[in-house]
Amino acid sequence: VPANMTMPLVIPDLAGKVVLVTGASTGIGGALAHAYARQKCRVALHYNSSREAAERLAGSIRDDGGDVLLTQGDFSIPADVERVVEESAKHFGRLEGLVNNAGGMLGRVAYADQTEAHYDAVMNLNARSVLTASRKAIPWLKRQGGFIINTTSIAARNGAGGGAGLYGSSKAFVSNVTRGMAKELIGFGIRVNAVAPGTILTPFHERYSSAEQMKAMVATIPQGRAGTANDCVGAYLFLSSDLLSGYIIGQVIEVNGGQLMP
């Protein structure tokens, strides 16, 4: 669905729910924040450094009649993660959904060149933040039930490459946390699943992938093109709805144009 079009599908059981989307200023997170708002959810929109982009997105959501809270935090710092979740839940008085989307590669570094500092930075941002945000959200989600959706990656299954191996490993952690958390939380009415995007045209690849690397990746996609942020939105909305996916937990939906078929 192009960003300037209203998604025609209305999912009735999403309206009115409070959803926190982390890493939501641009890319997949930004598309999700807008999509949830179009479903009449109340959206907590987290960003780290992209303040202007986040404010533009929040303004667009408000122009469309949506209810949105902007909240800033560095998700490599656990205290920031905790504060963002608490701010969001307390602002709206409740929380029904958490989308753990914040993350990044933080540079392409071969395994032979890894430093302890790089390991800590990547794992804190991509792995620890998911645990911290979920832990803080669980008491709120338990009140009425809800969902957690984690953003993992095609790199979690294919080992990544080109210096992205540690990023892929951090996302493999997230995929397995998704399964374990799903088993623990379903008894409280909290469904946990994940979405694994493939090669998606977002600021992520603008930052970390050269034109040559992108061309090589696209050549491996049967559908013949890289994906867009909006290509990913439907999987998240599907997993957010008890009506559509109430018997689905602990699953990772691969959104990659056939680039990986596990």
Regions found by a protein language model. Name each.
Residues 105, 147-173, 178-187, 199-200:
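Catalytic loop of short-chain dehydrogenase/reductase
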Residues 92, 228-255, 260:
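C-terminal substrate-recognition "lid" of short-chain dehydrogenase/reductases
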Residues 109-111, 115-120, 217:
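Substrate-binding pocket helix/loop in short-chain dehydrogenase/reductase
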Residues 41-56:
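Conserved glycine-rich Rossmann-like NAD(P)H-binding loop of the short-chain dehydrogenase/reductase
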Residues 134-135, 179:
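A short, exposed helix-loop element centered on a Lys and neighboring polar residues
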Residues 51, 72-84, 116, 231:
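The beta1-alpha1 cofactor-binding region of Rossmann-like NAD(H)/NADP(H)-dependent oxidoreductases
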Residues 18, 25-26:
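Conserved glycine-rich cofactor-binding loop
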